[in-house]
Amino acid sequence: DAPASPLADIEKHAAEFQKTISEQFNSLVNSKNTQ
């Protein structure tokens, strides 16, 4: 299941990275709200 191009692979990784950052940010905000 190789990507069509290196650019497509980069975009896929970027989207996953963005999602991870968003989740970490949300958990950080939520933990601050509960304190």
Curated annotation (Swiss-Prot):
Subunit structure: Equilibrium between a soluble monomer and a bound lipoprotein form. Apolipophorin-3 associates with lipophorin during lipid loading until each particle contains 9 or 14 molecules of apolipophorin-3.
Function per UniProt: Assists in the loading of diacylglycerol, generated from triacylglycerol stores in the fat body through the action of adipokinetic hormone, into lipophorin, the hemolymph lipoprotein. It increases the lipid carrying capacity of lipophorin by covering the expanding hydrophobic surface resulting from diacylglycerol uptake. It thus plays a critical role in the transport of lipids during flight in several species of insects. Has hemagglutinating activity towards rabbit erythrocytes.
Localization per record: Secreted
Reported tissue expression: Hemolymph.
Protein family: Belongs to the insect apolipophorin-3 family.
Provenance organism: Heliothis virescens
Highest taxon of the lineage: Eukaryota
GO terms classed as biological process: lipid transport
Keyword entries, A-Z: Hemagglutinin, Lipid transport, Secreted, Transport
Record's protein name: Apolipophorin-3
Induction cue: By bacterial infection.
GO CC terms of this entry: extracellular region
